[in-house]
């Protein structure tokens, strides 16, 4: 392992940034794609308190058959019937030590039991009492800054409801071979659902599973066949996180063969820094960082933040800044809880549901699983937008297929199952190729992680300096819903197909100012209302309800005051009396709202709304304010 002691000032004035004279305005402008996957954090665990995302202020929160919101997780503790989300650093004595706190289990069984057939009521009873713990901005300022300066996805999920290895295998191959999708397990490997690295199969009642190594096709092999340059930047202590090591073709590759040289070398993060700085990165890169910097509990978010900042720094300040996309993701939740039900396929969908390999009894979905943090850093994702399309690790592969096609190359990973291919986002809508921004923001400027005798020691220091104060007391019986679901106030602009889970403002810009559709509390009519600069007014705040599943583009639109929109321009008291509207997204333009009569809704700067045959595009803003 090599210490990365270099530290450059992150901020760089726009005046010193290279700005091209002509914007290409398409996916073909991307010449370099960098994939960087960290470890074991859930979306709510990191971003539940962030404004403008599907977090603790979710107006469409899942409820059980009794009407109890998912926030109320049942417990077996005598002090409290339920546990609400809680801030890990609430007690000042535990504030620093909570950086190296540990959550629950990331295993297949525990996380499926937390899912509990869609009830999402087993995080505490079936996983860990710490599963409902979370951080806020003060603990992870870099992560908040990346989300707010570039783009964060709040509907991005782990590929499988399970641990690290299968999620990372899916990250480069798009399958885990459930239902023998790509071949018989004893011949080709899988179904891969646990952190298993013994060169044999496991069996339950004679049925094989976790057959290892894996022998199906991976994305780097397809890139190699198309003469697309690629490399895996893997540090020496990260073998278990490098999915290339799970696959037989890489293990069998001659030491001087492309799969071994590019996929299994120990040319880690220092080489990435060098090549990003001098402009010699391959077209596609994978970063597998040092394990102590991976954010895998108890390794600290702060240590991982340094590596995130350094990666962004060398890309955005290097010669490839204007044509590079960096995706930062997390493999799985690490046993930290998330409140959004996984958007799994219909029961019985081919390759997506299976008998639990460990018991051959329960019939469970493979995934997609619970939400994890996901960012896109590029000139086309600047500005702090929220990407709302359902996505998972296969989405990164689907993006690469689209990107390769834009470069004139034919890359298609056939192992991606039909349902995933047709339902998971390819991430292209995350980008606004017509309006790139080449200015570079300032991040938190995290210090280099503590290092001694050839090893990172920040985790050890955290544990020793805060001995007895890393796992805060669980606040059983000492919570209020208002405190538990506290979130920052503010707003973010949405991109991508609209989904539930946010208070939204439908706004349009006119030369007279910004106007939004709205409703006065005392009126039954829709109006066009001038908005505040922070979109804080209740009168133009709405909740949308998808008709169908998380992939539907049909919605009921409800005023924050409770009534539902109709095509007549009036509001109805119930859904039964309301109309269903089609809401569609077009990249670089925005959202259209189409009535059942086929007309498009629009605003005007004169107080009235319009219904016309011409598309009228809205900017949809996700807002979080504590008057909700």
Residue ranges, per PLM feature:
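Fungal secretory targeting signals
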Residues: 1-24
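N-terminal pro-sequences and low-complexity stem/linker regions of secreted or lumenal proteins
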Residues: 22-513, 518-598, 602-628
